[in-house]
From Swiss-Prot:
Gene3D superfamilies: Putative methyltransferase TM0872, insert domain (1.10.150.170), Vaccinia Virus protein VP39 (3.40.50.150). The lineage of its organism: Bacteria, Pseudomonadati, Pseudomonadota, Betaproteobacteria, Rhodocyclales. It catalyses: cytidine(1402) in 16S rRNA + S-adenosyl-L-methionine = N(4)-methylcytidine(1402) in 16S rRNA + S-adenosyl-L-homocysteine + H(+). It is an enzyme of class 2 (transferase). This is Ribosomal RNA small subunit methyltransferase H. GO terms for cellular component: cytoplasm.
Amino acid sequence: MTRSTAHVTVLLEEAVGALAIKADGVYVDATFGRGGHSRRILSELNQNGRLVAVDRDPQAIAAGAEIDDSRFLLVHRAFGELAEAADEAGIRDVDGVLFDVGVSSPQIDDGERGFSFRYDAPLDMRMDTTQGETAAEWLARAEIRDITEVIRNYGEERFAFQIAKKVVAARLEQPIVTTGQFAALVRETVRTREPGQDPATRSFQALRIHINQELRQLEVALPQALELLKPGGRLVVISFHSLEDRIVKNFMRDQSIADAMPKSLPLRADQLPKPKLRLVGRPIKPSAAEIDANPRARSAVMRIAEKL
């Protein structure tokens, strides 16, 4: 049951400012969510500007239907399919692409979605509920090794192997089909307690990341965004945990360094390897005031780069 689906957009003004909006520009909001960033971008555009937003969550698509604006198009796709979404929208050479990655407050707060251990609900966890395997279905078939790797790699949980063994043993007695069942198994297994954090937190994060292939989606989306940008266009990415931020940091760093010099020398000046991105400023984090107003913003990090 949904208890609270209010969503407070994180780093709203900072993200839109980082895009360096041109009034007649073309922009992509690769993670529409509930449209906080999109609405703010639209407010900066004139009648010649255009915004294409992307989201794989059907509830986000439904929320986007409220925006009646000829400058705006919302595409139902995962952001890992950014190139396909751009083709569908008929855009190229855009002025900015924004990512606000990870799970949203409405997804967490809707107990029926199965993202949170705070509600006892079907163990689903799919961001796109129209396709793919649920978390319960995966746990029913996965081997101990696979469960261990997912929880260790995506949850950074040191009791991953013990949790995996517990899950496999428990499913022989009865199927694990609810968030309450999975959370109870994890709590029984994790022998240490971190202040202010439920023992199930890391395992729920890991399972969600795996079911939605969140890190892989980000890895394939960033090169597509770079290809889509025109020179001078901005790439802005907000992430919420170290696994995501590492991918963004490494991508931007690697693309800001020229490729190795070819062995076939001499070369003309136009043949010399050139970097593809310029890093813009330092990573930005929410202010103390924003974190106080919205505690879920505390782990956010925003990185900015400009295409050369």
